[in-house]
Swiss-Prot record:
This is Cocaine- and amphetamine-regulated transcript protein. Belongs to the CART family. It comes from Rattus norvegicus. Pfam families: CART. The modification Phosphotyrosine is found at Y41. Satiety factor closely associated with the actions of leptin and neuropeptide y; this anorectic peptide inhibits both normal and starvation-induced feeding and completely blocks the feeding response induced by neuropeptide Y and regulated by leptin in the hypothalamus. One of its GO terms (cellular component) is secretory granule.
Length: 129
């Protein structure tokens, strides 16, 4: 008798867990049907309650010069040809012996170029030795 109760208890628990989402979904549908949000999202576009933001001056004295300078830089960057070895990810250009091959930023070291055969990038001097 008690062994049948012990077997029945997990089965009833599993059935209850399966039915809980179904019961909760019906309560959510009822909550979604309430008309409390209808006044916020009305179908009629009424812009009288909206404030108009103040317009900033577009023609500030230094702004025109800055825009022109940025446009010149963009033109130069667009016309600049990127070598094939820089386009390929994971490859860096070759540098000469004694040339700076890395940059240190805090505890990190960034590789600028590959050292030629027979030399390696010294992590203290950051040069090909």
């Amino acid at each position: 008798m008690e062994s049948s109760r012990l077997r029945l208890l997990p089965v009833l628990g599993a059935a209850l867990l399966l039915l809980l989402p179904l019961l909760g979904a019906g309560a959510q549908e009822d909550a979604e049907l309430q008309p409390r949000a209808l006044d916020i999202y009305s179908a009629v576009d009424d812009a009288s309650h909206e404030k108009e933001l103040p317009r900033r001056q577009l023609r500030a004295p230094g702004a025109v010069l800055q825009i022109e300078a940025l446009q010149e830089v963009l033109k130069k960057l667009k016309s600049k040809r990127i070598p094939i070895y820089e386009k390929k990810y994971g490859q860096v250009p070759m540098c000469d012996a004694g040339e700076q091959c890395a940059v240190r930023k805090g505890a990190r070291i960034g590789k600028l170029c590959d050292c030629p055969r027979g030399t390696s990038c010294n992590s203290f001097l950051l040069k090909c030795l």
